[in-house]
Amino acid sequence: MNSKPSTPVATKGSNFLTSDKMVVNILIVTAIGMAVIAAAVGAGRDNPLTVQILIGAILVDIVGTILAARGIALPGRILVPGILTIAAGFVAYTRGGLYHIAVAGFPVVIVLAGLLLGVRGSFLFATFASIAAAIIGYADINGISPFSQSSRTGYDDIAVAATLFFVTAIVLRVIIVRLTESVQEAEAFGQAQETANVELKKLQGELEQRV
C-alpha cells in the first residue's frame, strides 16, 4: 500500500506554501545557507564550537530533506527550525549575548517556521526566540554567561528583541494571508473562466443544430 504524502501543518488555504515539494526546496536552501556560514566561521578558526553546532544542524537538515522527498515532511518542518533556534541561542549565550550576530538568526528562524509550519509556527517560534532572548539577556545582566555584557545589556534589550520577533511573525502572517487570498482569487477566476467556456461551447453547439 502506497503511503500518502504528509499533511501540511500550515493554516487552511496556505498549502501552496507548505507542500512537500516546497518543504524540500526550503530545506535545501537552508542547508546551503548553513554550510556557507559554517565555512565562513571555520575559516577564522576561532570559533570551532559554532562550526560543530552548524554541522549538526546541517546533518539534521539533510535527514529532514531526505524524509520530505519521500513524503514524510513533518520531521523536517519541526526539527530544522527547532535546532536552529537552539543553535542560535547557544552561540549567542556563549559568545556575546544579545549583541552577538547569532541573535539576528532568530527572525530568519521565525520566517522559516512560518514557511514550514504556517502562521501558527511563526508565532510559536517567535515565542521560543523571545524566551531564549530573555534567558540570554538575564544571563548577561547578572554576569552568568561566559561572555557577559552586563555593562551594556538591559531589560529593555530583551523587550526590544521580543517585540521585533513578534513583529516579524505578524508581518509574515500578513504576507501569507495576502498570498493565499491571491491564489484563491486566481483559482476562482480560472474556474469561472472554465465554466464560461463550457457554456459558450454548449451555446455554440445549439446554434449549429438550429442552423
Q: Each predicted region: which residue ranges?
A:
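Perimembrane helix-loop junctions in membrane proteins
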Residues: 42-45, 140-147, 180-188
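Membrane-water interface at transmembrane helix exits
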Residues: 69, 92, 172-180, 184
